[in-house]
Amino acid sequence: MNPSRCRILAVGKVRRSWIQDGIELYRKRLPGLEIIEIRDSTPDKEADSIRASLRPNEHVIALMEEGDAVGSIPFARRLDQLGNQRLAFVIGGADGLTNELKGRAHWQLSLSPMTFPHELARLMLIEQLFRAQAILQGSPYHRA
């Protein structure tokens, strides 16, 4: 997994400083990872902004409650199988993603069957990206 080939498109700003601190901690460990903030709006307007931000050659991974629930090791393996493809992880706002965006995704992924604030989902995703990289590199960070 190459962080410089990954982008996170997330609706909304991170308002809690402790979440922002966590995001920055892992972002420093994943050089090249890009985070695009999409302005909060109606689901249709958010979808328009997300579509406009997606690149034609990106493998779109939509985060949603009803997506595939996978453990950290299968997640790392899946990212490894994607090789050098450019990845766009999409995190919706309070109302989630539109059906059109869900359908456009190459993979629908769930971090948990529970619902989390989008800013916390962003932190959880970036930690899992770092963990996936550690798993693939054989780093002791992942001890499960």
UniProtKB/Swiss-Prot annotation:
UniProt GO cellular component terms: cytoplasm
Residues annotated for S-adenosyl-L-methionine binding in this entry: 63, 92, 111-116
Gene Ontology molecular function, alphabetical: rRNA (pseudouridine-N3-)-methyltransferase activity
Enzyme class at the top of the EC tree: transferase
Catalytic activity: pseudouridine(1915) in 23S rRNA + S-adenosyl-L-methionine = N(3)-methylpseudouridine(1915) in 23S rRNA + S-adenosyl-L-homocysteine + H(+)
CDD domains named among the record's database cross-references: RlmH-like
EC number: 2.1.1.177
Keyword S-adenosyl-L-methionine: yes
Pfam families to which the protein is assigned, alphabetical: SPOUT_MTase (PF02590)
Subcellular location: Cytoplasm
Domain of life: Bacteria
Keywords: Cytoplasm, Methyltransferase, rRNA processing, S-adenosyl-L-methionine, Transferase
Entries under HAMAP family matching the protein: 23SrRNA_methyltr_H
Quaternary structure and partners: Homodimer.
Similarity remark: Belongs to the RNA methyltransferase RlmH family.
Function: Specifically methylates the pseudouridine at position 1915 (m3Psi1915) in 23S rRNA.
Protein name, as recorded: Ribosomal RNA large subunit methyltransferase H
Source organism per UniProt: Parasynechococcus marenigrum (strain WH8102)
Gene this protein is translated from: rlmH
